[in-house]
Amino acid sequence: MSKKLQNWAVPLIAVLLGMLIGAVLMLIFGYDPFWAYYDLFSTAFGSLKNIGEILRAMSPLILIALGFSVASKAGLFNIGLPGQALAGWTSAVWFALAFPELPKVVSIVCTVIIGLVAGGITGAVPGILRAYLGTSEVIVTIMMNYIILYVANNIVRFGFTADMLRSSEASNRISASASYQTDFLSSLTDGSRFNIGFFLAIVAVFLVWFMLKKT
């Protein structure tokens, strides 16, 4: 089997095996797997709104997967991506809430850059420790997930100003000028929350592919 064919076959076989195992488990517990999978796919792809919501949910997952792929290419196992993503999200949300009146383009560019920097810094810590002290990146990244989680929670509770908060533990919604949603994309997908984050993720896919394959 060629390498190219293997790259396509392995994920496909994994998905099919997962569905097969799921079907067996449903049969064991007395459920009909045919109707279960029918409902799954008809709900997911049965309307433009649902398709838009799927694409919206895919966007951060694509970016997180890209982060893993870069580390994996370097021979490292980065299991700290949830924490690194949370660091980026928290930083970007703080900026969006702190400067709600910025033009949309400026706000989006700034939040993307701030999220990249915050996630990059938290990802660099285990990398530096691995490079200079020989520590296991697996252990460090797992531990940092929890550190970042609690730090982010405290930033929301105590680091956000009163006008940024809806309650003691939740921020306000970001302004329309800072949102990645647009009226055009929302109307295109029947009112879903589909936004330009999906297109940013696709651009990131191309950039990472170019970096890994062409440089």
Locate predicted features.
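Single transmembrane alpha-helix segments in multi-pass membrane proteins
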Residues: L25-F29, W35, F45-A98, V112, ...
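Short helix-capping/hinge motifs at transmembrane helix termini and TM-loop junctions
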Residues: F29-Y31, F99-E101, G134, V156-F160, ...
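Transmembrane helix-bundle core of multi-pass membrane transporters
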Residues: T141, N145-K214
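A cytosolic-side transmembrane-helix exit/cap motif
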Residues: L55, L102-V105, R130-L133, R157-S167
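Transmembrane helix-bundle signature of multi-pass membrane transporters/permeases
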Residues: K4, L86, T90, L116, ...
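N-terminal signal-anchor transmembrane alpha helix
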Residues: N7-I28
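Interfacial loop-to-helix junctions that mark the boundaries of transmembrane helices
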Residues: L5-V10, S42-L55, G80, V105-V109, ...
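Interfacial/capping segments of alpha-helical transmembrane domains
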Residues: A23-A44, G159-R173
